[in-house]
Amino acid sequence: RDPEMSRGLGDVYKRQLSCFSDTPGESFQTYTNPKFAAEGGYSKVAESVMVATLFTYAGPNYVAILKHLGMDAEADAAQAEIDKMKANIMESAWDGDWFLRAYDANGEKMGSKECEEGQIFIEPQGFAIMSDIGKDQGCDKKTLAAIDERLNTQHGLVLNNPAFTKYYIQYGEISTYPGGYKENAGIFTHNNAWIICAAAYAGAGDQAFKYYSEIAPAFTEETSDIHKTEPYVYGQICLLYTSPSPRDIS
């Protein structure tokens, strides 16, 4: 069908196309695209691996919609870009046991074993698993094992580990918080849910239920004295772990 559809759907369709851009800053593909590689082999634009995995996770649904609309050529082109993205993620963002969080504007890895602090981040892991990236190489199982070993606590999965203990200009605000607070190794309910879904998807049902039990109000009565919410409320964030004052869940 003509993408200039009625009721504004044409504009929606056009906006989807921007997801397939290879312009620096718009797609993780730019990191490994020689067309944009500056001296030193990177695009001088920070690249989010989380966004890349969101692309590979949501992309197949977009392909299915195109096929439903009879736009087979567009569907094939979109699938090719998804496959390309998966290959780029495996080549440039697999750290051996988990996926990187990003490359900064200097082309340095974020969320790698090579980093002094912030060696692993929660955000890209679940979507990479649910995108089947590296599944044939066991990357899903390795990632889940790393999550359990390095991110899990009694109160849920922390955002990153180890927490930052000093300011990193390339990371900005996240390294200004005390360890265990907000984006510096805090525990966010929403990205815990991503890992719960990913563990279930990968067949690790017990692991998924364990993580659910750590954040679900029905299972946290033993720690209710430190919760500043009603017993039926899922908190947005848990301020625990390495925090100087480990007491608040709000």
Residue positions per predicted region:
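Active-site-adjacent structural elements in folded domains
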Residues: 23-50, 106-116, 128, 163-185
